[in-house]
Design a protein with these regions (language model features):
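Well-ordered alpha/beta subsegment
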Residues: 164-167, 171-172
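Hydrophobic-ligand binding "helix-grip"
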Residues: 69-127
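Beta-strand/loop substructures that line and gate deep hydrophobic ligand-binding cavities in soluble
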Residues: 101-159, 170
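Beta-strand residues in well-ordered beta-sheet regions across diverse protein folds
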Residues: 22-24, 84, 132-134
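Hydrophobic ligand-binding cavity/cleft-lining segments
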Residues: 1-73
Length: 187
């Protein structure tokens, strides 16, 4: 998404091959990190998100976001995943709706925000990977932009904190998995 209202990019160097890093990111249970669960609960409290909740099942990052309504725009195994949706994030019970990849660029339903997020791996050298997670959002009209920027003015702190907590956790798990696998292979 070349045109955007906000862009947040986070990256880590991980001592593991790209396929281990990407699989770890796909399978990582975002809410397994207590402070992330607290941030999500705090948003729900602040925004007055209510309704009945079914018991949460531990899902990987990609499975959970797809279950929430995100669609896949681009997927290159072990290299790149780009997911996108439209929503009105200023509501407590935000509903993400996937946009087909071939319609995403021209999607302009009023009073919506288009959001893309990506996971990307780049091999730096053998068993060393640059892992990037990026989020971009673009409001479809001026009224949506006004609402979104007001929401973003405070919500970004939690959203950014989630990424700051998530990437090191993915790094630790991928490096641990790679080290364990390497030790098993040499034994």
């Amino acid at each position: 998404m070349p045109k955007f209202d906000i862009r947040e990019r986070f990256e880590k160097i991980i001592n593991a091959p790209v396929e281990v890093v990407m699989r770890t990111a796909y399978d990582f249970d975002l809410q397994s990190i207590l402070p992330i669960r607290a941030i999500i609960s705090m948003r729900e409290l602040i925004m007055g998100a209510g309704g009945e909740k079914s018991p949460r099942k531990a899902l990987g990052l990609v499975a959970e976001t797809r279950a929430l309504g995100w669609g896949t725009l681009v997927e290159v195994p072990n290299q790149l995943l780009v997911c996108g949706a439209h929503c009105q994030p200023w509501f407590g019970n935000v509903k993400f709706t996937a946009i087909p990849a071939d319609e995403f660029a021209v999607f302009d339903l009023p009073d919506q925000v288009k959001i893309v997020w990506s996971l990307e791996t780049t091999k730096i050298e053998t068993n060393k990977t640059r892992f990037v997670h990026e989020v971009r959002a673009f409001a479809t009209d001026d009224e949506a932009r006004r609402k979104f920027m007001r929401y973003w003015s405070w919500a970004r702190f939690g959203i950014i904190a989630i990424r700051i907590l998530l990437l090191p956790a993915i790094r630790r798990r991928a490096e641990h998995e790679w080290k364990s696998r390497s030790e098993t292979d040499t034994a």
